[in-house]
From Swiss-Prot:
Belongs to the ATPase gamma chain family. It comes from Helicobacter pylori (strain J99 / ATCC 700824). The keyword Cell inner membrane applies. The keyword Cell inner membrane applies. This is ATP synthase gamma chain. The gene is atpG. It is a peripheral membrane protein. GO terms for cellular component: plasma membrane; proton-transporting ATP synthase complex. Gene3D superfamilies: 3.40.1380.10, ATP synthase, gamma subunit, helix hairpin domain. Keywords: ATP synthesis, Cell inner membrane, Cell membrane, CF(1), Hydrogen ion transport, Ion transport, Membrane, Transport.
Amino acid sequence: MANLRDIRKKIGSVKNTQRITHAMKLVSTSKLRKAEEVARNSRAYALKLDAVFDDVLSKMKNQGIEDIQSKYFRELERLEIKKVDIIFITADKGLCGGFNTNTIKKVLACTNEYKEKDIKVRLRGIGKKGNEYFSFNGIEVLDKINNLSSMPNYERAQEFMKKVVEDYLSGKTDKVIIIHNGFKNMITQEIRVKTILPIGYKIIHQNPQPSETQETITSEPSGSEDEILDSLAEKYVEYSLYYALIDSLAAEHSARMQAMDTATNNAKDLVKTLTISYNKARQEAITTELVEINAGVEALK
């Protein structure tokens, strides 16, 4: 009978866990819908910012301004990359499957790839889980910030990027990339790697065209060309990080929703298995008691 009591306790414990994981799934689903809407709107703004950026560059080129001296386009002179800063974004919490692990693996892979080319790499971390991992493994992270990936805030993202931009403009780093796990759809996340500095590829490797939505974008230069580029570049760099934070949060809720759904289903299966075991043990106990009773009756005859 002690065995039956143990099985009953296990069934009760698993059912409690099932209720918790189901509740967490519902919460994540609700948060995901909100985060997805924010991500969609933020992406629209990011695309519009890119359109304005291309619009201004196109107008400048049409005016015959080829020699741009903006401080954000230093790669026109700095052709060799020797130092790279990697900004990684992970969650502040766990229970989201391989969400954080996949991001960390990509960071390590990129780090090793750069080091094989004799390129110095510095890490800058956003998110408790990633920062804890690298700290535990003795890997230096230059800048650490928590409670930002779980609550994206433009002002805090802007403040974080100030030091990054200062290091780039002073020559302490030649390239800055952002690595995060992004939202693709309700059930899929994908690792995204984006170069935010240098941004001169807009001129070197692309041929910026005037915006096709002139009725909504009328970016007429006011001030020097370099001032305009500097202003747009600052906004582009800051918003690139902010959008990555929003995109990462949506992906985190998606991953947690899936993880909790899987955990809930596994708990259901385990309850079924334990219930079968309980019924078998109960039947065996009843059979044993009947055999003992019959044996006692026979002994009295």
